[in-house]
Amino acid sequence: MTHPLVEPIRSLHRRIRADVVAACERAALESLSNVASDEEGDTIYAIDRVAEHVLIEEIARTIATDSAPVVLVAEGVPGGRVIVPGGADASRAAWTIIVDPIDGTRGLMYQKRPGWILTGVARHQPLQREGSEQARQAVLSDIELAVQTEIPLVKQHLCDELWAVRGHGASATRVNRLTGDSTPLLLRPSSSATIAHGFAMISRFFPGIRAELAAIDDEIVEEILGPPQQGKAQLFEDQYISSGGQLYELMAGHDRFVADLRPLFERRRGADGPALCCHPYDLCTELIARELGVMVTDEHGRPLDAPLDVTSDVTWAGYANAHIRQLIEPLLQQALTRRGLLA
């Protein structure tokens, strides 16, 4: 089964990818890493603006019409949510489209790691008449189409494109951006029943709570693998500052477990907690991972249900398979409970 928005969104992603790579080729690292603004959802860097300029223009040109507008949720747009085309009647919208134009900005702008374009599509949930209750807001689990496209480093000529329609599996291709040729790509999550000698980690990207996150990580690993052995590495970690990139590593079989627990600490500490957490747009392509067999949950082991906005904080865990989940999830929840982090 296909979806009417698969090809328009893939085309949108290709244009964003081309424009961002071209900007990276032209610009100095310092200019791309300048702070453009501080939005509700995240800090916006100069490189982000390159993608945002394309986003509304392409959606207006290829997807949205006055008779069938689109509700666009994205970083960088006014209020994090706009109607495309502007001035259209939102009650007539068929789709809510949530986009992260560049996920992994920090690694990409310094040319350390590829970034990703992330898009999720859900049926629009219209608001009811004034004075009545609002219809339920669309959440991550309502997404029925997800598209994820790699933004390569300047020195990299191959890049991957992934997409999935809910209940109908996932597809992927590897594209040569120099020739335009593409070949089918088989993504297969790890089937290993252990984390030993594999990649498994808890995200701790930024200062503030890294010691506590590392302590949880070490507790889980020691419970599973025993105390560290002198001169031997029991397992490895990769702090990829991109939620889409982390999902890709699970899909590709490179990683066996990833968890981002930052919102739990913010909830516990209130205003004194870390200001930067994962948001719904960072995880709007988790459908692709689930269609490939990756198990993606919240801190309680439930499906992700954050609203499609740019401000909600999202705690998530990804397990390559059911064996890994059975191995880690109880220990993770015990560690969180001991610290009073599970509500």
Residue ranges of model-derived segments:
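N-terminal subdomain of lithium-sensitive/metallo-dependent phosphomonoesterases centered on the IMPase/IPPase/PAP
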Residues: M1-I102, A322-H323, E329-Q333, T337-A343
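Short regulatory "switch" loops immediately downstream of catalytic or recognition motifs
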Residues: I47, E57-A64, V73-I83, G120-E130, ...
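Conserved S/T- and glycine-rich ATP-binding loop of Class I adenylate-forming
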Residues: G104-T105, A289
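Short, conserved micro-motifs enriched in small and acidic residues
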Residues: D42-V50, L108-Q111, I241-G244, L276-L283
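An extended, acidic
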Residues: V6-I9, H13-I16, V20-C24, A28, ...
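Active-site-adjacent structural elements in enzyme catalytic cores
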Residues: S37, V73, V82-D100, R106-G167
